[in-house]
């Protein structure tokens, strides 16, 4: 927050509008300050609140815009206080969260599943290829996960299904492979 007061007593009310240059990064309250001949020397506070936008967009600068004073007192009318520069510190990091696998694949159709979701909202679609290191032992569905700016925080399920290969080969290991994320979002 910041505080504001007048330097001298006005002979009429003085109103100063308060706005944010980018309400997607920060908001202000109240939207105006009103000084009278009785409260002119009392500081009034403006609360600045950063917006948590879920985007890994780095620290973002914006401005608290203080409008020109409006008053019938000619000493104050149209005086324009200095705007205030503010930075919204970003707390979002691009990446994804993968759950532990649940279940065991078998040659009789046994399945194992895990989920994956993004850690921050992308600015463009994010595609992740999913495959098996040995398709003769296990298949993977789906083969591609698509995360958008609207479904990024919703978990998507990947299912591994064992393949009956009719060979007496005991337990066989294979790996579910997650490809590198593909997106025009630079994060």
Predicted regions and their residues:
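Short boundary segments that mark the start of a structured unit
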Residues: 1-187
């Amino acid at each position: 927050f910041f505080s504001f007061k007048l330097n001298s007593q006005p002979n009429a009310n003085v109103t100063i509008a308060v706005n944010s240059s980018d309400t997607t990064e920060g908001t202000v309250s109240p939207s105006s300050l009103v000084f009278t001949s009785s409260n002119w020397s009392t500081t009034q506070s403006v609360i600045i609140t950063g917006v948590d936008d879920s985007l890994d967009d780095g620290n973002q600068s914006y401005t608290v815009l203080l409008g020109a004073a409006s008053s019938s007192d000619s000493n104050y009318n149209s005086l324009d206080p200095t705007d205030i520069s503010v930075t919204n510190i970003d707390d979002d990091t691009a990446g994804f969260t993968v759950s532990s696998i649940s279940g065991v694949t078998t040659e009789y159709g046994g399945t194992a599943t895990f989920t994956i979701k993004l850690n921050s909202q992308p600015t463009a679609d994010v595609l992740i290829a999913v495959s098996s290191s040995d398709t003769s032992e296990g298949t993977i569905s789906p083969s591609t996960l698509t995360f958008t700016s609207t479904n990024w925080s919703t978990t998507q399920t990947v299912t591994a299904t064992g393949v009956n290969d009719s060979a007496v080969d005991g337990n066989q290991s294979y790996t579910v492979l997650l490809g590198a994320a593909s997106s025009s979002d630079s994060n």
